[in-house]
């Protein structure tokens, strides 16, 4: 491992815009220390909520807590029901008639694209991506086939954790534009039929958030103090793991102003909110109101397991946390109808399934599957994937896994055994510079050796296994990374739009860019960029567009069951996705060599496999094993068709 980076962590905001540069909206709002009192903050939210309207009946109210501030987490919040059930921020005809709008389960058929406003496209030429820039690129995303966007945090923040350190939940970071710019972006996305979800950083704030600044000065035991988790000694919750071990030694940090320790699961500049305090829960519901009234389609719930702490536990996924998620879901559903909650919970599958029982989240990222896709590619055998699929716990019919290969963080190896982690590090991060915490800070293409066949295979699995695929911006063109940037900025470099100035990301002076563009020779923006790939019919980008278009023809991929198909070659993975009379056979060769496989497809005897891409039909399936050959890292998607159109019942 590289030398510990704890000091780096405290400096990591350097070179990036700071909140003070970005004109903090809270200063001057009143209060002796320049910080708005919470009640005033609540009033502001009420005034600004959604479209400049006062808080609607039925939304959360910030009432003074009962004395002592603690409270029973299972207690029902003070919420008055409201009759409105809106679609896209406006009551629909049904809602206006008082009828709930039936859920569409749109997220099951979605193709989600994770995008960082900061590094996607600079619309005003100041070197930093912004909402004007993102809006200008919506046509590109639509043509790619994307149907939903997930935006990383774009709120006012000192950016010491790239926005996951929120200083104001209900505004836009000035570097990214205005709330008006956000509204225009949302309207334009909706006009193209795209949904938008954003990160909701529930667990913690920045130390610069007015709530923390007030808490640290407040009297111990007071309602303001109790917005965060304090202790006189760092001995509470001993043994709870540190999530960023390269940067932090402990989950407690001494605050000289409060003269107490505060709890933080992530960086020391990210104090955990105290969800035992009903005021915190209400405050977060007001944040939810603010964005949903604007018409947002849902939230990625960041760091969801860590909301509550209890002595003697791992302080993760506690019953109290699930109780709060249920309240959050019920609150949203009663007021806004179908808005999606996507859990970011880096936990084993059995734990994840607890969020997916129908009354908490709609989706959860499949953290156990992701590293096993990479393990299967490294070992060139199907077993690691099969193991996850066989052990997969049941989830409610309306729920869905969110599948991903890469995201804005390190490729986290928290969900594999220490031996598997070592194996993955050896296979994908031989250079210690590529490692961070318990993971690997590399993008998809460098991880897979820029090998086009392996990239296509990885995408073919992402788009055919049960769940909704999530693409990380830039991975559609096989962008590289910069492991010499601090922390996870390695994988957050500017989008490469062209071979021109600043990769087409910005017209600014190159020295003013929010992050350097990639110039590593194999991934240099002059070679790897959208413009060049759009012009090349065989580019990765055009190939992926075709793959997405094919997936969209078959609802079985988003909504169907999974049937594993037995074969006689451990290097080949085979399964059928079924929905009604639609059945798609997926066969994937994990090895770099040609493979043959005999598949037990007796249940489909009589069916004709038709290639979903080219339409060629193979000989009919018989009761005896069906023989297929696959090229290196080859894969097939076959539509199983009976001559008379009937597909047999599942076994
Ligand atoms: O807001 C703090 C962090 O929350 C998310 O972290 C998640 O990613 C971590 C890896 O970087 C992972 O170890 C942890 O279990 C997750 O909660 C968010 O995605 C991070 O960017 C952020 O720093
Ligand atoms: Ca800009």
Predicted feature locations:
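Cationic, low-complexity basic patches in intrinsically disordered or flexible, solvent-exposed regions
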Residues: 54, 64-67, 100
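Active-site and adjacent substrate-binding regions of carbohydrate-active enzymes
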Residues: 2-6, 12, 16-21, 25, ...
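A generic structured-segment signal
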Residues: 45, 62-66, 74
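Compositionally biased, intrinsically disordered low-complexity segments enriched
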Residues: 40-41, 47
């Amino acid at each position: 491992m590289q030398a510990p980076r704890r000091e780096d962590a405290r400096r990591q905001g350097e070179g990036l815009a700071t909140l003070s540069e970005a004109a903090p909206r809270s200063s001057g709002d009143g209060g002796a220390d320049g910080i708005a009192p919470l009640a005033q903050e609540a009033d502001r939210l009420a005034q600004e909520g959604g479209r400049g309207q006062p808080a609607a009946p039925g939304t959360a109210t910030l009432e003074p807590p009962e004395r002592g501030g603690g409270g029973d987490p299972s207690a029902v919040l003070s919420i008055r029901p409201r009759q409105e059930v809106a679609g896209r921020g406006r009551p629909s005809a049904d809602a206006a008639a008082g009828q709930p709008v039936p859920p569409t389960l749109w997220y099951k058929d979605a193709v989600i694209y994770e995008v960082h406003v900061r590094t996607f496209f600079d619309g005003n030429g100041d070197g930093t991506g912004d909402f004007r820039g993102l809006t200008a690129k919506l046509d590109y995303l639509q043509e790619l086939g994307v149907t939903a966007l997930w935006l990383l945090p774009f709120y006012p923040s000192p950016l010491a954790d790239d926005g996951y350190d929120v200083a104001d939940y209900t505004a836009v970071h000035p570097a990214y534009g205005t709330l008006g710019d956000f509204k225009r972006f949302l309207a334009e996305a909706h006009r193209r039929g795209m949904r938008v979800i954003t990160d909701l950083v529930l667990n913690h704030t920045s130390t610069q958030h007015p709530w923390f600044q007030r808490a640290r000065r407040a009297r111990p035991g007071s309602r303001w103090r109790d917005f965060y988790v304090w202790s006189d000694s760092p001995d509470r919750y001993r043994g709870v793991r540190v999530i960023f071990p390269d940067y932090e030694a402990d989950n407690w940090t001494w605050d000289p102003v409060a003269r107490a320790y505060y709890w933080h699961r992530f960086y020391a500049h990210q104090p955990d909110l105290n969800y035992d305090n009903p005021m915190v829960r209400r405050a977060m519901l007001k944040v939810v109101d603010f964005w949903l009234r604007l018409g947002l389609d849902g939230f990625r719930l960041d760091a969801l397991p860590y909301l509550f702490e209890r002595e003697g536990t791992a302080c993760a996924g506690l019953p109290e946390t699930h109780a709060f998620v249920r309240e959050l879901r019920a609150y949203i559903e009663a007021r806004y109808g179908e808005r999606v909650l996507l859990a970011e919970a880096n936990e084993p599958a059995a734990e994840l399934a607890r969020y997916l029982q129908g009354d908490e989240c709609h989706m959860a990222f499949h953290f156990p599957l992701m590293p096993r896709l990479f393990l299967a590619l490294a070992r060139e055998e199907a077993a690691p994937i099969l193991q996850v699929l066989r052990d997969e716990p049941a989830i409610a019919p309306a729920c869905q896994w969110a599948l991903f290969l890469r995201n804005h963080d390190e490729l986290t190896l928290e969900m594999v055994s220490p031996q598997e982690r070592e194996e993955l590090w050896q296979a994908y991060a031989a250079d210690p510079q590529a490692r961070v915490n318990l993971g690997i800070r590399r993008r998809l293409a460098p991880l897979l050796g820029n090998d086009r066949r392996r990239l296509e295979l990885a995408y073919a699995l992402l788009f055919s296994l049960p769940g909704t695929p999530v693409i990380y911006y830039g991975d559609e063109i096989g962008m590289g990374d910069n492991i010499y940037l601090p922390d996870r900025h390695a994988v957050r470099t500017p989008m490469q739009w062209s071979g021109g100035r600043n990769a087409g990301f910005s017209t600014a002076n190159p020295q003013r860019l929010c992050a350097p563009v990639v110039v590593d020779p194999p991934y240099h923006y002059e070679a790897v960029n959208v413009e060049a790939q759009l012009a090349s019919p065989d580019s990765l980008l055009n190939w992926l567009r075709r793959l997405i278009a094919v997936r969209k023809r078959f609802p079985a991929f988003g909504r169907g069951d999974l049937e594993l198909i037995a074969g006689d070659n451990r290097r080949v993975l085979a399964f059928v996705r079924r929905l009604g009379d639609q059945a798609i056979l997926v066969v994937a060769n994990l090895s770099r060599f040609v493979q043959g496989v005999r598949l037990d497809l007796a249940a489909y005897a009589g069916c004709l496999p038709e290639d979903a891409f080219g339409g060629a039909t193979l000989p009919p399936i018989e009761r005896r094993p069906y023989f297929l050959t696959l090229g290196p890292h080859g894969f097939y998607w076959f539509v199983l068709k009976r001559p008379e159109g009937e597909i047999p019942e599942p076994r």
